[in-house]
């Protein structure tokens, strides 16, 4: 009976197995959620709260379960029990959903922590002695995860680092040795992409480290390596940046400067578009650097060349005529005075001695007069001394004295040049001297065999710093020289004015003073020539430069002549159009008026002589028509029978209606029509007599026009016969589709099939067209009246 009663007793309905959690596994679920929270690197407060709520709900369910059993014993409360069970099942479902969401959140947190910690492990430098013994979480999910504490250089403190792809082999080897009692298998498909992501992260970390190294290298682009050899070899230099400029300097340990022979060496820079060129054009050797610093100049002597050129060019930096010797350039740079001296020497023909003397004076000298420059040409006896040149053939002397003081930045430059065949010489000036010194202090032409010299001295503020400077150039006549040779050289110099002017202008094209200097040199050369011709004995020219303080007029004839010629040149330059002409354009200079009259008279006399007529005729052609008093005759069309009709005649027979319409195309909009009379006559019908009168005023090359009162009889008869067809032409109104449809419907009496919406759209378009037309008319009126259109 007891068994039957147990069978008949209503049992409590068990919850669904999918939502049921056995007692043995209830604690495991709680432990699992706790472990998953610990495995997450950065704990989340929201996840903790959800887990607490889930655990509390589970406890409440377990507490309510015995009460539900007690209630189920009573059969009268069956419905109530069903409701209770439904509520409990819904609670269990909610709890399981919360647990699943907690698992997903914890898994996401673990994957994020894995990615962060793997990146930190790759960027940092972990200790090599750390060996992992925990199973890999990619394949297995243990309940208790052992986290390793690894100290890195980049991270301060201890961090929990989960294993990544780098320890895959070690972990797989150690997994089978552990028991599988408390291990649950996870979904492999869910974790395999994580492993791939770890591999990608590893690659990205390596690339980032490589780029960091490159960035560190690029932060110092100016670091480059160069090799200086004791043999002064030029070594190519590699740069790590494209924008750097290679600067090479040659140093020696022995203090001896031995430049290599002339040539151009190219240093190739990788990555840069252009090469860097170092040019060395030195063909001599200097024994010691200390000697260079202490010496005041260099003397270069060249001999044994092969051929003599016919003419000698300007003294400048250029190659020789026979291309046997390269140009020479010497540059000195001193740090104390920050001065630079340049010496340019042109190689001359054989048996030519070139003296290039360059003195350097700095602020240490109080009196510049202590350094004097003298160049004396004595008899050709072979004797030589300091600052003197004695040769027995045409020679060139080029002396340049540059003075750049630290107090006064201006410079005092001299240039003495002597060349065969009356070679014009340049006037040397320094780069700091920007003023136009057009007044030469001295200009001398020296008697010698094919020798001419010019000596110029800049004035102005330079004299203040060089007040005590006095230089003289005494030159004695050679006893056994040829006088005719000198005359030839003087004549060639006088005739070669173009060469002299070109050489003077070539120094500085921007200043007009150089041109005047060339003229002054030419005039002084003429004066020296006359003096030389008058005196046949031994002549000595002395050019002296007085001090600024001395007021005595101890100057020679040559400076006076140059001053007078200089003033004449200034007056010639100062003549301008304003001084010669007034505001009305009349000439104020009577001399120019006389020249103009003579210039006009001479061509007339010449023409009269050629034609044989001594009388000058007046050939003025009178105009045939008076263009100033031209008036359009007023045409009266009131007497005409048809004032709006005109006759068109005298046009080619090949003309058609289109051709006549093209002639009167401007009247077609207002209304114009053509009625033919014969092949050369037609009637033009206009919209009004005013338009017809306007058309009569036009001129056309192919057609002629006249009113109908002056027309031929045939034209008048045609007009009377077709009087009803010659009504004034009316302008065609602007039509639209809506207007045409309305006209057709009204004429035929047919009902329109157009809907109301289409009719409203057409009316709207018509209104927009009217508004647009009104605005255009208003804008046209505003333009004519000159009103502002911004308000429109």
From Swiss-Prot:
Expressed in which tissues: Expressed in placenta.
Sites bearing Phosphoserine, chain numbering: 688
Renumbered residue ranges of the record's region Disordered: 32-61, 527-567, 772-792
PTM annotation (Phosphothreonine): residues: 712
Region (EJC-binding motif): 7-27
Coiled coil ranges: 751-783
Key word Phosphoprotein present: yes
Keyword check for RNA-binding: no
Keywords, ordered alphabetically: Coiled coil, Phosphoprotein
PANTHER family found in the cross-reference section: COILED-COIL DOMAIN-CONTAINING PROTEIN R3HCC1L, GROWTH INHIBITION AND DIFFERENTIATION RELATED PROTEIN 88
Subunit and partners: May interact with the exon junction complex (EJC) composed at least of CASC3, EIF4A3, MAGOH and RBM8A.
Protein name: Coiled-coil domain-containing protein R3HCC1L
Organism encoding this protein: Homo sapiens
